[in-house]
């Protein structure tokens, strides 16, 4: 019997939060929307609506480590926002190393002949999908490894 998962991937930035969801099997992540950050309460309300609609069980948040692997100022800001958000939504959080996901998202847009400079929200959604996909892939690999060990 397959265990269903409903995770929400978030790419948290100063101005926007990219949001991604996954299919119920946990195989494919896709961008859903971009939340324009205005106030914390409004941000929570917009994300709460998505959480309710999709019956989300866990938040997967990209943590922007520095290239040397340390947590810089931006990573601490993301943790602070996420901690408050998780408490408001009463959901667990799992962090994923998001180094270079925005760059990867921009490269994907360029490959599609879409201007990254005019589509910042789309970059955030794609980055959120990359973050969530990374988490889903790790989760699936770990599940397969534990099944292999049982035999």
Swiss-Prot record:
Keywords: Cytoplasm, Hydrolase, Nuclease, Ribosome biogenesis. The keyword Nuclease applies. GO terms for cellular component: cytosol. SUPFAM superfamilies: Ribonuclease H-like. Belongs to the YqgF nuclease family. Signal peptide: none annotated. Could be a nuclease involved in processing of the 5'-end of pre-16S rRNA. Its main location: cytoplasm. It is found in: Cytoplasm. This is Putative pre-16S rRNA nuclease. GO terms for biological process: rRNA 5'-end processing. It comes from Nostoc sp. (strain PCC 7120 / SAG 25.82 / UTEX 2576). The lineage of its organism: Bacteria, Bacillati, Cyanobacteriota, Cyanophyceae, Nostocales. The keyword Protein biosynthesis does not apply. One of its GO terms (molecular function) is nuclease activity. Its EC number is 3.1.-.-.
